[in-house]
C-alpha cells in the first residue's frame, strides 16, 4: 500500500496537493501545525477540508514554541500584515516565519516514519515563492537528504507545485475537477478570510491574479500545466 503525508494548511496550494495525493496514493494522512498564527481560522478550515476529502487521518500538532522564536507579521499582532504593494518592495517580507518549513517538514517526516509513508508532500513553490527562502527547491532537496540520513529511511519530499505559477496551480485543481471547491473552501488570506479573502494582502493578490489568468486562457494554461507535471 502506498502512503503519503501532506503538510496541510487548508490553503489553495496544500489543498491542491492533497487532492492530487488522494488520486495518486492508496492512503493519505494530513499534518497541520498550530504555531500561533494570526490567521488561526486556517486550522478549522484544514480540519473541515480534510474531513470532506476523506483522508485516513488528520493530525494537528502544537508547535507554538515557534511563535516564541520567530518574529513575523503572521505570528505577532503588533507587526502589521503588509498589502501586496508593500510586500513587493522587500526581498524577504515580514510574513516570512523563520524556520517554519524546516520544522514542518521534519515533523511531517517523523510522522511519515511512524505510519510507514513513502512521501511527504508540501505545496511550496519557487515560481511564486513570495521571497521565502524555505520555499526553494534547493532547500527542500537539502533538507530531504538530511532528514533521510537522520532517520535512516528514504522518505521522499514531493513538491508538486514547485515549478508551477499560480495560474497553473488553479489549472491543476481544475484538472482534478475541484477548482470551485478550492476557490470557495480554502483559506489562503493572511488576514484569515476564507474563499476570496481580503483582496489586499500579498497572498490574496497572488491567488486572485492567478485565477484571473487561468480563467482568461484555461486551455492554454492547462496545456502548459500538463507539460510541466507530465499529466495526460
Swiss-Prot record:
Keywords: ATP-binding, Ligase, Metal-binding, Nucleotide-binding, Queuosine biosynthesis, Zinc. One of its GO terms (biological process) is queuosine biosynthetic process. Pfam families: QueC. It catalyses: 7-carboxy-7-deazaguanine + NH4(+) + ATP = 7-cyano-7-deazaguanine + ADP + phosphate + H2O + H(+). Transmembrane segments: none annotated. Its cofactor is Zn(2+). Binds 1 zinc ion per subunit. One of its GO terms (molecular function) is ATP binding. Zn(2+) binds at residues 189, 198, 201, 204. CDD domains: QueC-like (cd01995). Pathway: Purine metabolism; 7-cyano-7-deazaguanine biosynthesis. ATP binds at residues 8-18. The keyword Mitochondrion does not apply. It comes from the Bacteria. Its EC number is 6.3.4.20. InterPro entries: QueC, Rossmann-like_a/b/a_fold. HAMAP family: QueC. Belongs to the QueC family. Catalyzes the ATP-dependent conversion of 7-carboxy-7-deazaguanine (CDG) to 7-cyano-7-deazaguanine (preQ(0)). This is 7-cyano-7-deazaguanine synthase. It comes from Photorhabdus laumondii subsp. laumondii (strain DSM 15139 / CIP 105565 / TT01). The lineage of its organism: Bacteria, Pseudomonadati, Pseudomonadota, Gammaproteobacteria, Enterobacterales. The gene is queC.
Amino acid at each position: 500500500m502506498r502512503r503519503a503525508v501532506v503538510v496541510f494548511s487548508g490553503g489553495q496550494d496544500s489543498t491542491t496537493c492533497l487532492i492530487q495525493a488522494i488520486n495518486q496514493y492508496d492512503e493519505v494522512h494530513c499534518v497541520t501545525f498550530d504555531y500561533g498564527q494570526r490567521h488561526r481560522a486556517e486550522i478549522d478550515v484544514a480540519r473541515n477540508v480534510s474531513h470532506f476529502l476523506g483522508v485516513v487521518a488528520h493530525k494537528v500538532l502544537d508547535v507554538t514554541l515557534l511563535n516564541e522564536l520567530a518574529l513575523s507579521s503572521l505570528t505577532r499582532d503588533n507587526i502589521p500584515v503588509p498589502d501586496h504593494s508593500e510586500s513587493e518592495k522587500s526581498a524577504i517580507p515580514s510574513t516570512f516565519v523563520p524556520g517554519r518549513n524546516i520544522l514542518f517538514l521534519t515533523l511531517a517526516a517523523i510522522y511519515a516514519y511512524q505510519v510507514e509513508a513513502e512521501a511527504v508532500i508540501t505545496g511550496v513553490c519557487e515560481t511564486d515563492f513570495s521571497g521565502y527562502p524555505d520555499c526553494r527547491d534547493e532547500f527542500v532537496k537539502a533538507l530531504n537528504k538530511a532528514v533521510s540520513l537522520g532517520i535512516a529511511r528514504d522518505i521522499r519530499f514531493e513538491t508538486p507545485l514547485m515549478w508551477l505559477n499560480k495560474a497553473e496551480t488553479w489549472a491543476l485543481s481544475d484538472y482534478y475537477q475541484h477548482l470551485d471547491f478550492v476557490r470557495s473552501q480554502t483559506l489562503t488570506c493572511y488576514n484569515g478570510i476564507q474563499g476570496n479573502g481580503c483582496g489586499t494582502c500579498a497572498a490574496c493578490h497572488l491567488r486572485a491574479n492567478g485565477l484571473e489568468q487561468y480563467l482568461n486562457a484555461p486551455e492554454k494554461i492547462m496545456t502548459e500545466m500538463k507539460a510541466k507535471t507530465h499529466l495526460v
